[in-house]
Amino acid sequence: MTEVKSYKPGTFCWADLATPNPTAAKRFYSELFGWKTQDNPLPGGGAYTLARINGGDIAGLMGMTEKGIPSHWNSYVAVANVDEATKKATSLGGKVLAPPMDVMDLGRMAVIQDPAGAELSLWQGKKQIGAGRVGEHGALVWNELQTRNVDACGAFYTKLFGWKTEAQKGVFVETYTLFNDGAEPRAGMMPISKQTPANVPSHWTVYFAVNDCDAIAKKVASLGGKAVMPPTDIPDVGRFSMFFDPEGAFFAVLQPNQR
């Protein structure tokens, strides 16, 4: 269990869910992880929901009105200056999907797309640094890029965030790439399997920590979700599983090995 007061640039700091049915999403994730939720009205209408555990912000949920866009989890990386990071992303071959903008007095953000098409949000925190708790049951614990171009994305992210790469033996792929900042691991990367349908884009996956992966898998099914990967051991790491929630948003859970 970890309380967070600040984030170093280049660290994943937040995740939020965009869904056409926020009421159902709140019910699903609250029952699954034990989240408490609070709706915060937005200036243009609607609400942004904060999910909390033990008094700390964990993640966000928001309604989505655009047609044809499936429910999805967005990943956020902390940066010192959103405007500069966005310019750097474009110079490295990325695209800007949403230019830098202020989010009230909470912070400043932008949404970019890497050279292989995976979307990622950049966050310059002000009043809101990001998640207040990480690594405990129901909170963020890992982020993983599944991509169709490992080489291009490895070069892109190392130059954008100052990450380093470390090749490791994979469980389902020959090589799993670990991104780190020279001291701490920051994220993982693996190629999308050849069996994956061509219409599945490169994407960042959000992992939530859980105390019991198998129990969570059963609970997901009872709440209307669908397993994509059953509970599976990762040597020296823990036990994980992947799911679609009832609205079709993809996410994963990890039961870390006891240290």
Question: Where is each model-derived feature located?
Answer:
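N-terminal beta-strand motif that seeds the catalytic metal site of vicinal oxygen chelate
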Residues: 1-26, 72-75, 123-155, 163-166, ...
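Active-site-flanking structural segment that lines cofactor/substrate pockets
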Residues: 57-63
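Vicinal oxygen chelate
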Residues: 1-8, 11-20, 49-52, 64-88, 90-141, 166-184, ...
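Core segments of cupin and vicinal oxygen chelate
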Residues: 7-9, 13-56, 91, 99-111, ...
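Short, low-complexity, polar/charged sequence segments that are solvent-exposed and flexible
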Residues: 34, 56, 79-80, 96, ...
